[in-house]
Amino acid sequence: GMMHAPISAMIRISSPIEAAQWASQLDEGFVRDQAMSRTADHFARKDFEAAKEWAESVSSNDGAERVIGPVTKNWASRDPEAAMDWVSSLPEGKAQHSGTWAALNGWAGKDPAAASDYLANMPDSEMRNVAISGFSDRLVWENPQAAMTWANSITSDEMRNDALTRVGRSWARK
């Protein structure tokens, strides 16, 4: 509705970097979150290297997960392992988690066998739990049983319950 009009207009008439700067300086809240993620998504498709630089430059800022997620998702659709290496080098926290989720979600769509090998070799950690969550959310559309098994292997109770609920819902809709 009205909310999206200024964001769409801004993305359409600006260079990606102008749109990124504009989105970054909005007041924190829903509009800024939407602007950041939509700009990042647009930017990653138009000029990936510049989008990646922007993502790195904001990676320790509040709201960085809105940029890291879409940029990683775009990259993971082409080269998931490189995307995951990059995400691993980011500062720990919400942005890194968002990237991890997006990388494995994209990887599950591209090559689920390679993605599950990668997950199997990750040490147990919060990052692995996030990775499994992203992976199982996507895997459910191809292989719901395997997605349930993976989601059930998450070692954090809260995250495991969330993942199982989401996978179960998607499975029911399939």
Where are these regions (language model features)?
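Non-catalytic tandem-repeat scaffold regions and their flanking low-complexity/translocation tails
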Residues: G1-K174
